[in-house]
Amino acid sequence: MKIKAPDALLAAEVSRRGLMKTTAIGGLALASNALTLPFTRLSHAADTPAPASEKVVWSACTVNCGSRCPLRMHVVDGAIKYVETDNTGDDNYDGLHQVRACLRGRSMRRRVYNPDRLKYPMKRVGKRGEGKFEQISWEEALDTIASNMQRLIKEYGNESIYLNYGTGTLGGTLTRSWPPGKTLIARLMNCCGGYLNHYGDYSSAQIAAGLNYTYGGWADGNSPSDIENSQLVVLFGNNPGETRMSGGGVTYYLEQARQKSNARMIIIDPRYTDTGAGREDEWIPIRPGTDAALVSGLAWVMITENLVDQPFLDKYCVGYDEKTLPAGAPANGHYKAYILGQGTDGIAKTPEWASTITGIPRERIVKLAREIATAKPAYISQGWGPQRHANGEIATRAISMLAILTGNVGINGGNSGAREGSYSLPFERMPTLENSVETSISMFMWTDAIERGPEMTALRDGVRGKDKLDVPIKMIWNYAGNCLINQHSEINRAHEILQDDKKCEMIVVIDCHMTSSAKYADILLPDCTASEQMDFALDASCGNMSYVIFADQAIKPRFECKTIYEMTSELAKRLGVEEQFTEGRTQEGWMRYLYEQSRKAIPDLPDFDTFRQQGIYKQRDPQGHHVAYKAFREDPQANPLTTPSGKIEIYSQDLAKIAATWELPEGDVIDPLPIYTPGFENYNDPLTAKYPLQLTGFHYKSRVHSTYGNVDVLKAACRQEMWINPIDARKRGIANGDRIRIFNDRGEVHIEAKVTPRMMPGVVALGEGAWYNPDASRVDQAGSINVLTTQRPSPLAKGNPSHTNLVQVEKL
């Protein structure tokens, strides 16, 4: 397709054939270059006869990708020689299919034997962040932690102790690292009076908050297997081809279901993702942060052409038009009035209006509206990229309106407009007791809680459980997480706050590797990998099949590493709560106890020792496809939603109250309706005169956030690069592979450029999770996007707006 500036932004209808032709040469070049990877050599090992001393042990990849895949460790003489994946089941997603790990999980051996493994306890001897440590004994490390924790609780109270966000072992049971209230650290702290909790998460803070006011609670979605009943699939910023790419993830279901239904698939995203890769029917590029404007333009077409499902809106919804508008709301405060320009702003949300904001041609908006409205049923889904913006909460509510307006909620082949859902087994988790501290903050506001804790209030900063914080954070537990620095926004600000050890006086990091965050520890404890201990792995997003993995111990712990259960049990002994913490059980004892509890709810589970040999237990949803809100759709009176009205709330009275009472900075908007609001650092911000490019992030296939970010073969196979459109590159004299600088007022990153038509003009992208590697001037040399992101939170969730950034790019 021919693109001419300055109309490039409006040339947004991209055919699959045209894009594949454009990118074919680059793809062939990549396939034929001289990069040598040892995957082939390793795979041949599986074909050779197994030595007599070899044993195969079931293990798991427990990271935060949505899958949690089984791994089969081939162990010889106490060492892992190679890794395979699930060999049970078949290729048919109608049955108990195989759950095949991706290259990340299959490279687990390289994590276990990585040169940067933490070997023994250490204490800091330099400044935080310098990575200067000296070895100490376990006794000294645990004594130091226990005595400092007791001192800080005595001086500041339990509210001063914070459990930081960490998802490195999210899929574990005893080793589980998130949410904080479900971890062994939480159990230990609850035995000692509690801790300052957090709500929300870096993955989905805004969508969780926003759609709570639409559907009540966490917004569910149909399983991707149900796409076999769909005529059309529309994905807003949903990229399972990279975010959930293994056999336990969504890509497998998406493709197999579409083969049955022959459903068209349209991807709406600033970047042409691997979920497309020639499998989609159309890619529609869109400016980041403008999804709600597109939805408003689509809604205008649907309403004016009488394409909405009026009976559904009348029966199941609140606030679509004057008939269902709640008492006390403004007379023109309903959604239909907003779209038609009869609301307070007086602007009709026509396709022309939406086109100037989104960069999508008017004609394509009109066509898309008709396609969505007339496809019966349509599977409309949003990933978690669109919500990770300054206006993310309101954008998520807007995207869900497409499913609501067309009556696709609660039926086979439809969806709620949220991310895809899945079936899960009721497996018992580790009990963590009750937290006596009721106060919590947003997971994104912890640096502020260090810097200005007593100034933080409920109405201004989202403090929950009381009107304000009484004390700042004085101690941080950082278990299996890289959010002290690497995964938290505005790294340079976080560095300045953490480096002052008079503010937060004690930081304990528990990890397997010397991560970017580990360098900020006062006490650094070496954890065991999943291969070096026994646990259950679960919580996979796997369509209409769920499973539990027996992740057994394949090898002995390396060096002086201990399990998290050993560490916390030893600390409990020093703190005088050992009996309450352990209840007399070892790690295996807890596993046997939890397993027997689980068998009460899942009677088909085999006995413990049989399951240990079996390695994985799979079970299909007895209802067939998971259909979100099916019971509500069938009988809304008997099965109301958990919203105040019991219905889908297009107009939220609760949001109206929040909008009237919360203290918001200029530019932040909370509204009872799913309107379009640009948010800060938007495409039309005056700041674009200085920083003209929008920078967005994405989940890169070589890592799960930052996990696996230190594996050499994955880094070589999937190089960290900044994606930039040829139009923007040409203006700056940038060629593919050139070293460039990306910068704004928050920091600077040096990285190589990937010049590609797979990016929308005016937008650049960096895969999140690259390990922060600053030089002496604090210029990052690894492509860590959070050097450039902001710590200003989103309005409602107080979440991370990681994809809302303005930058400039120059060739070095």
Spans of features found by a protein language model:
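Extended redox/cofactor-interaction regions of prokaryotic respiratory oxidoreductases
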Residues: 2-4, 180-268, 275, 293, ...
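N-terminal export/assembly segments and adjacent metallocofactor-ligating motifs
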Residues: 2-307, 333, 458, 466, ...
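A glycine-rich phosphate-binding loop feature that marks nucleotide/adenosyl-phosphate handling sites
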Residues: 166-167, 315-318, 372, 415-426, ...
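Long, well-ordered, tryptophan-enriched scaffold segments
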Residues: 260, 271-375
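Short beta-alpha connecting loops at secondary-structure transitions
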Residues: 280-286, 546-557
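Active-site phosphate/pyrophosphate-binding segments
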Residues: 331-452
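Phosphate/diphosphate-binding loops
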Residues: 505-506, 553-572
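Long, contiguous, secondary-structure-rich segments that constitute the structural scaffold
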Residues: 564-614, 706-708, 712-723, 727-812
